[in-house]
Curated annotation (Swiss-Prot):
Its EC number is 1.14.11.-, 1.14.11.27. It comes from Dictyostelium discoideum (Social amoeba). This is Bifunctional lysine-specific demethylase and histidyl-hydroxylase NO66. InterPro entries: JmjC_dom (IPR003347), NO66-like (IPR039994), RIOX1/NO66-like_C_WH (IPR049043). One of its GO terms (biological process) is negative regulation of DNA-templated transcription. One of its GO terms (cellular component) is nucleolus. Residues 1-53 are annotated as: Disordered. Belongs to the ROX family. NO66 subfamily. Oxygenase that can act as both a histone lysine demethylase and a ribosomal histidine hydroxylase. Specifically demethylates 'Lys-4' (H3K4me) and 'Lys-36' (H3K36me) of histone H3, thereby playing a central role in histone code. The keyword Ion transport does not apply.
Length: 514
């Protein structure tokens, strides 16, 4: 793998398209590719503002009409094929309605909770039920700890009671009848409805989306108070559950990078918000909000927690940018490779930090400042963004194809499609690919991913192309969701046009108009 992504992806396919095509004597023009240029820092040293930073707007302020889509209708409406990005927006809009998406991002996301009361209208009906849970256990090899937890919260202590081995239905229901909560980990692996929901929402958020399902008997609590490192949407599927939310204990726990340990009641104080969710209701709260939940004494609770924005922060992006900037500096700047002075340990370090007026210490700290200035001239922001996008793709769920998408792609072809210049095609999913241009053109995709989190297929989803193909690939990506002719691809060589489309077809990335 070429520089910039070599630390992210260790094993790549060796497949390369359009390398040794016969040009029939035609002389090709040399392809000129604009590479990402490092962006310099505006200050020589990091500056910390005394004013609080305002949250970055995640969507434009302009309010647009978005059709609301029920989660039971994912993949079975006209938007599923017309433009899956619009469908994804519609699914989120349906979840948070009557709040509109622009207001959600402006007022709630990453800031405070949102409670949506449906007044008894269970819009999630039949999405996932107790019977669905039972069938999942019976039809799949699910294991305790890996796929299923049985827990209880007794005398202010969480207790996990997982046996070893397979989670047989009889064992799970035995623990449930004894007052334990049942947690299904990554149910999208085994249930298509949950897979469709998570896969669709990851299209909207453009980062990983996961889920857990919780079944709690009447009058029980399965987990101690804690906060998570993800933003969560609680969808109450059956029964009722009382939720208590508590403010972060200090500023360092606002939007945390890691989940907390279990808290005692004394550590969290009184809740600032308490609500009982009924079937059809929704509750959103950001990462860092301390929470606990208990089912009423007269009814069980079944809910799904949909989570997102794990390790998807400015800090994560800047970390990748700085790491790559340091690699570049070590490669290109002699000063970064020079040895440290023998006496640096006598002047640098916490025990020497109070030697403010020491000339030798000042000389050494000034040197660090000079190197920081040079590092600031080498910030490869676009490479860092590519690394973030590629990591998301390799961790993401594969797309759930509609019947029409299967019918018009390699997924359902009994015989291989013969691609011609007049063939019209388009990407199946625009957000399922990422084009990275370095010494070659690399198209990453998630079509080969499995439904198990962090597990890709036998090989990561990668197709390599020559630089002559870059404009064609950009044209294909930018044209989505419109169909385009193979003959109209911006490549001089006609055979190479066919090669590009064939490569995408064989990887299951495109569908044909007819």
């Amino acid at each position: 793998m070429k520089r910039g992504l070599e630390e992210e992806i260790e094993e790549m396919s060796e497949e390369e398209v359009g390398v040794n095509n016969n040009n029939n004597g035609k002389k090709k023009k040399k392809k000129v590719v604009k590479k990402s240029k490092p962006v310099p820092l505006t200050k020589s040293v990091p500056q910390v503002s005394s004013q609080p930073l305002r949250p970055t707007k995640l969507v434009p302020k302009k309010k647009t009409e978005i059709r609301e889509i029920n989660i039971n209708d994912i993949g079975s409406n006209e938007l599923s094929v017309a433009d899956q990005r619009v469908e994804a927006d519609g699914v989120l809009a349906g979840l948070i309605s009557p709040t509109i998406i622009e207001d959600f991002y402006d007022q709630y996301f990453g800031q405070k909770h949102l409670y949506v009361k449906r007044n008894g209208d269970n819009i999630y009906k039949n999405f996932f039920t107790k019977d669905s849970l039972d069938k999942m256990l019976r039809n799949n090899l699910m294991k305790f700890t890996e796929n299923v937890d049985v827990t209880n919260y007794v005398d202010f202590q969480r207790i996990t009671l997982n046996p070893e081995g397979r989670a047989y239905p009889s064992l799970v229901w035995k623990h449930y009848k004894e007052g334990c909560s049942v947690r299904l980990l990554n149910p999208q692996t085994f249930n298509s409805n949950v897979w469709k929901l998570c896969s669709t929402l990851q299209t909207h958020f453009q980062c990983g989306v996961g889920a857990n399902i919780y079944l709690t008997p009447a009058g029980a609590q399965g987990f101690a108070p804690h906060y998570d490192d993800v933003d969560v949407f609680i969808l109450q599927l059956e029964g009722k559950k009382e939720w208590r939310l508590y403010k972060p204990r200090d500023a360092n726990e606002v939007l945390p990078k890691k989940s907390s340990e279990n808290f005692t009641q004394e550590e969290i104080g009184e809740p600032y918000f308490t609500v009982t969710l009924e079937a059809g209701d929704l509750l959103y709260f950001p990462r860092g909000v301390i929470h606990q939940a208990v089912s009423p004494s007269d009814v069980h609770s079944l809910h799904i927690t949909v989570s997102t924005y794990l390790n998807n922060t400015w800090g994560d992006l800047i970390g990748k940018v700085l790491n790559r900037a340091l690699e570049i500096a070590n490669e290109e700047c002699l000063e970064f490779r020079e040895g440290l002075p023998r006496d640096y340990t006598q002047y640098l370090g916490v025990i020497h930090s109070d030697k403010v007026g020491d000339e030798r210490r000042k000389e050494l700290t000034d040197k660090v400042g000079t190197l920081w200035d040079k590092l600031g001239q080498l910030l490869p922001i676009d490479i860092g963004a590519d690394q973030m996008a590629v990591k998301y793709l390799l961790d993401s769920l594969p797309p759930v194809l509609t019947q029409l998408e299967k019918k018009h792609s390699i997924e359902d072809e009994t015989t291989s499609m013969k691609i011609k210049p007049e063939t019209r095609f388009r990407l199946i999913r625009a957000d399922s690919v990422r084009l990275v241009v370095e010494d070659i053109a690399i198209l990453f995709h998630n079509a080969d991913n499995t439904r198990i989190y962090h597990q890709v297929g036998e090989e990561p989803g990668v197709v390599e192309f020559t630089l002559e193909c870059v404009d064609a690939l950009e044209h294909i990506i930018d044209s989505y969701p419109s169909y385009i002719y193979t003959k109209d691809l911006p490549i001089e060589d006609d055979d190479q046009k066919l090669d590009v489309v064939s490569a995408l077809y064989e990887k299951g990335l495109i569908m044909f108009e007819k």
